[in-house]
Amino acid sequence: MNDKKLERHIAKSEIYELVCMYMRGLDRLDGPLLKSVFHEDAYCDYGFVKTDPDTFSKFCMDALKEHIANHHMIGNSLIEFDDSEDMAFGEIYFNAYHKTIVEGVNTDVIIAGRYLDRYERRNGIWKIAYRSEVNDWSKTEPTNDPYFDDSDCHRGGRQDDPVYKRNKMYRP
């Protein structure tokens, strides 16, 4: 493997990690983490909101805190480079699940779409410089999830989620 291929492989890995941290920030309602994946002068264009990362992060935290649960998953991730070694473009497929209450009824909102991103490496660090969201389809229906009524299950949370308790990840 030549040096350029190796550098691009490392860059793709670092960019993919940004995408994962973005999803964790949404699901765990971790505003500082969500904001950290963007350059300060980045632009977020989601159609219904077009703004800077700080305002976008606050918007997400306010909107998602009203949900019972959120779960974002990454699908196909195509990261491409043009001539610059410090700029890359991504098409990141996602599925977003939101458990909400609509008119007193627990409701599942499922969205499938893609993030169209421009990433820039500045001072050796990759971050999102531009992100847009394309929604390909969505589905809304009443929730049917009796499995999660079992109190013995580990439940995902917000900032009290087990992922933030790494010091307790040992066998008793």
Model feature map: region roles:
Residues 26, 38, 94-96, 132-135:
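Short beta-strand segments enriched in hydrophobic/aromatic residues
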Residues 97-107, 138-139:
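Short, cysteine-centered beta-strand-loop-beta hairpins and adjacent loop/turn segments enriched
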Residues 31-98:
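A solvent-exposed, acidic/Ser-Thr-rich amphipathic alpha-helical stretch
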Residues 87-89, 112-146:
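Short beta-strand edge/turn micro-motifs at domain boundaries
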Residues 1-24, 28, 32, 36:
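Short, low-complexity N-terminal intrinsically disordered segments enriched in polar/charged residues
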Residues 141-172:
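Acidic/histidine-enriched, glycine/proline-rich intrinsically disordered or flexible terminal extensions
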Residues 72-74, 110-115:
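Short, surface-exposed coil-to-beta transition loops
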Residues 13, 69-70, 108-110:
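Transmembrane beta-barrel outer-membrane domains
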